[in-house]
């Protein structure tokens, strides 16, 4: 299946995968917060990752102040295998 078509048809599955990976982060590095799906991108050329790969971005929101406190990025390959992740 075409990667773009698969993402469009199954975007909730991709976001849920990113949330699952975020929840596996060591608790001392993970904040209890509201998680909001932000974007899904296909990277076709990247300096560090084998491409094409998928970047899934989640927004992290402080529950008390309703304020953005960071972002979580998950990178997966076409088979949905883990490539990398960043918490900023």
Which stretches of residues belong to each language-model region?
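Exposed beta-strand-loop-beta-strand "reactive/processing" segments of non-cytosolic proteins
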Residues: 33-74
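A short, surface-exposed interaction/processing loop segment used at functional sites
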Residues: 69-88
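Short non-domain terminal segments
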Residues: 12, 46-47, 84
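Short, non-transmembrane alpha-helical segments in secretory-pathway proteins
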Residues: 1-43
């Amino acid at each position: 299946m075409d990667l773009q078509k698969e993402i469009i048809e199954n975007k909730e599955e991709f976001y849920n995968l990113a949330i699952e990976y975020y929840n596996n982060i060591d608790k001392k590095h993970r904040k209890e917060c509201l998680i909001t799906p932000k974007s899904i991108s296909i990277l076709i050329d990247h300096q560090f990752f084998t491409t094409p790969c998928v970047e899934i971005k989640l927004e992290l929101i402080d529950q008390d102040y309703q304020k953005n406190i960071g972002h979580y990025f998950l990178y997966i390959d076409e088979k949905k295998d883990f490539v990398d992740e960043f918490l900023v």
